[in-house]
Amino acid sequence: MTLLPATLYAQIEQSMPIACVDFVLVRPKSGTTSLTEVGLILRHSPFGEVWCHLGGRIQRGETIAQALRRHAREALDVDLKLPRDIQPSYVYQWFPPDIAPSDGTLHGDDPRKHAIGLSFVVDFIGTPMPQGEALDVGFFSIENLPAPLWPGCEQLLRRLFRQPSS
């Protein structure tokens, strides 16, 4: 695969939305079979060190499943259990503040780019080991998320797990 020069990619990022995958790992809460914990990573961001879901852009020629697996490997060295034709559970938008919608559209904050996040809840295989952008990994109940979270991440998680906003 040919990668774009950094300057050209930066120009593209400033000119159009970027297709991304956003996902959280899930596992049963310790001692239960019905409650779920979500896996989040701690990472550097424009907001300092924050907890957030995993994900990133989809590369040209890459399927959604391949993008999900690549980001899981690069951040946590795990594989994912995915159906053959995986479909997003939610589509979430991320905007820089200067172009963020003011009409009440739910969105996350990303000062770097406008992104369309195909969002997933996925099972994984292996033991998560933080690497690459992941400084740490933790599993949390949706009712007890860590702080600080990337702005918009909590709203995305609540939509993925159909929880009311706090």
Residue ranges and their predicted role:
Residues 23, 68, 118-122:
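A structural signal for short, well-ordered beta-strand segments
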Residues 31-32, 126-130:
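Short helix-loop capping/hinge motifs at secondary-structure junctions, enriched
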Residues 25-27, 42, 124:
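Residue-level signal for short segments within beta-strands and strand-turn junctions
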Residues 119-121, 129-162:
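NUDIX/MutT-family hydrolases
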Residues 1-31, 102, 109-110:
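Acidic, metal-coordinating catalytic segment for phosphate/diphosphate chemistry
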Residues 77-127:
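Active-site segment of metal-dependent pyrophosphate-handling enzymes
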Residues 33-79:
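Conserved Nudix-box catalytic region and its N-terminal flanking loop in Nudix hydrolases
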